Each structure stands twice: as structure tokens, then as C-alpha cells.
Amino acid sequence: MGRKIVIVGAGAVGGYAGAHMVQAGEDVTFIDPWPEHVEHMRKQGLRVTHAMDVAEFSVPVRALHVTDAQLLSKEKPADIAFVCMKSYDTAWATTLIQQYLAPDGYVVSLQNCMNEETIAGIVGWGKTLGCIASSITVNLPAPGHIHRGAGKGGAAHTVFRAGEVHGRITPRAEEICRLVGYADSAKVTGNLWGERWSKLVANAMGNGLSACTGLTGGEMLQNEPIRRFAIRLGSEAIRVGQAHGYQLEEILHLPPETIALAGEGDEDAMRVCDDQRFRDSKRTASGQRPSMGQDMQKGRRTEIEFLNGLVVREGEKVGLTCRANAALTDIVKRVERNELRPDPRHISELRLN
């Protein structure tokens, strides 16, 4: 206790983790760019609900709009800053909080995608840590309200994985594990980059598909052409990660090689993937929509270039062509530009070599 924590981005993941920290008595300040959300948090706090098994709670919180961040200059410097913004906002969010860090303070990327390098380019590698939130299924349905489309992961699934970029287990990584552990199961990892790429594979298999089809996670699972295309997306991303030397972890409760083989035409592996994904669907509300699908619905910019687009670019570096990821990236960008409307046929009628 006594550590000053700042969370830049009080959206679904930042709000969820931060609300639990506040509930546990930690000193947390939220900074967010959405005025209505900040105002609601100031007046009524944060409300956290779950689709199953967990009681609702509300906590009073301290929230600042980004334009009021300068108030931090009159206070004790921040010991820990969590950046929980969309990937395309990482640079400015890190720059914003950098000047308010304590000399031994550090920044934690609690985001999707691979943003540690961007953060390190601003504050230095020595002040950069990462934390993955795996299968957390949270969203922000209204100002001041965080909803999780499932229960807690608990012993069945470790949700948070905190680690140093160099892979050593340190007191800092253990401290982050303790803080996010208020929200759900957590562990310290010595394999941050492998964990990061594994989470990126999982996101690449669902986020962009939801964005361009307009379907929820449950609806995509019931659509065989889309379900198979998701496996191909994952297969390409896994091969890229392996080529870069990442030690991949389990992805969607499946061995990476099983997904990779399924995407390359192994029907036995495909049946294993289908069986596991249908089992997993019973633990999540059927109407849960992946975050990029939510962004598309709200008319917001997507992270497609930081997910499937990144897979394509990293594949090119090691001589791998990722046709499925390239096609999806193009379709999502066209939907973003309103050249196309979200439609499952964008995928079901797609023909690739």
C-alpha cells in the first residue's frame, strides 16, 4: 500500500482492473479522454457487473479528464502508470504520463497488441513492463459501467500475466501481478513476448472478423465458413510467431501447433479446435462482442493495423505471406471507411489461394 497508481485509459480493461484495485484500498487515479465517462466516475464512481457468478459492485473513484492531467504536477509523482488505451493512442498516452512519473516509476502496457516497444521509445526499456489480459471479455456499455461477459477465470484460467521485457522475475513484475490479481487470477511470466504474441493470435482470430461481419462471438462460432477462416488467421499468425522465435503459449485453450495444422488443412486438428471452442463458448455470454466489433458499432477507429496488419508486416520480415490476414485487414479498413457495410458474406464468399 502507499504506492501511487495512475491508469491512463479507464475503459473496459483499465476500468475493470482499476476498480478492483480501488476496492482493495489502493491509491488509484484514472485519466480518460471521454468527458461523459469521467464526469460519471466523478459523481457516481465505477459500477462493475458480470454476466454470471459474480455480484455487482460500485466504488467511488478519482477520475481526471486528459485536459486536467496537469493537476498531477502538484502531487506525489506516480510510482506505477498503467497504459490501457487503444494501441494507436499508446504514444501520446505514454508521453502524457511520463512527466509525472517518480524517478523509479515505471509504465505497464495493459493493452492488446505489441506496444511495449512504443512505450520504451518514450520512457526507456528500463521503465517498461507488460501485462496481458487473456480472455477477459469486458466492455464499457455506458459511462461509468464496466461489464464482463463471463464470470471470473479463477483457477480454471489465468487471466493476467505480468512480466518484464527481459524475462527475469523481479519485484516490479510481482507487484503488478499483485495489483491486477485483485480483479482475477494472475501470474508473473518470464515469457512476456511469447505471451504477447499468443494473445495477439487469439485476438487476430476474432476481433477483425466481428468488425467486418457485424457478428457476435457466438454467432461467428455457429458460422462454419467464418469459424474455419478464423482458424486460418490463427494458423498464419502462429507460423509468423514461430519464425520470429517466440515461445508460444496455449491459445484459446489449444496447443498452437493444433491451430496451425488445422489452418493448413488438417481435418483432425480442425475437429479438435472446433470441439474446444464450442466448450469454451459455454463459459461466455453468447451475445458478447469482441472489442473491435464494439469499436466498429460505435464508429470508432479499429486496431486492425496493430493486429492482423501487424501479422502481415511481421510475416514479410521472415518471408511468410499471410493471405488471410492481409485480406481481413483490407476488408476491415474498407468497412471503417464506409465503403462496405458489415456483412458475413465478406468472409463466407472470400476465395483465397
Annotated model-derived regions:
Residues 3-4, 79, 158:
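Nucleotide donor/acceptor-binding cores
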Residues 2, 231-353:
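NAD(P)-dependent Rossmann-like dehydrogenase/reductase catalytic/cofactor-binding core
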Residues 1-54:
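NAD(P)+-binding Rossmann beta1-loop-alpha1 motif at the extreme N-terminus of oxidoreductases
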Residues 32, 52, 65-67, 111, ...:
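Residues at the C-termini of beta-strands that transition into short coil/loop
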